[in-house]
Amino acid sequence: MAVEVKYVVIREGEEKMSFTSKKEADAYDKMLDTADLLDTWLTNSPVQMEDEQREALSLWLAEQKDVLSTILKTGKLPSPQVVGAESEEEDASHAA
């Protein structure tokens, strides 16, 4: 018999993602918290968006927080390697 530990991120009663590592589950949960905050903030934007568009943009911005932070701090895009690595990490985490 095999025993498997699984960490599940649940939002509003819905399973969002499961992980084998508590650290990864906590990071994903924190990213979802950030996306929720961004979604709330974007509702005050002068740009009108459908709810689905705003939610997708909020999630994407939260996923890209390191790149966004670099842009806001330096006024420049990070090197293509950093941007590419961020996208690859996101693809890998969604495959889990």
UniProtKB/Swiss-Prot annotation:
Question: Pfam families attached here?
Answer: YebG (PF07130)
The record's InterPro entries line, in alphabetical order, gives: Uncharacterised_YebG, YebG-like_sf
The protein, known as:
Uncharacterized protein YebG
Q: What lineage is on file?
A: Bacteria, Pseudomonadati, Pseudomonadota, Gammaproteobacteria, Enterobacterales
Recorded source organism is Escherichia coli (strain K12)
Q: Name the gene.
A: yebG
Q: Which GO terms describe its biological process?
A: DNA repair; response to X-ray; SOS response
Which GO terms of the cellular component aspect does the record hold? cytosol
Lineage, top-rank taxon, reads Bacteria
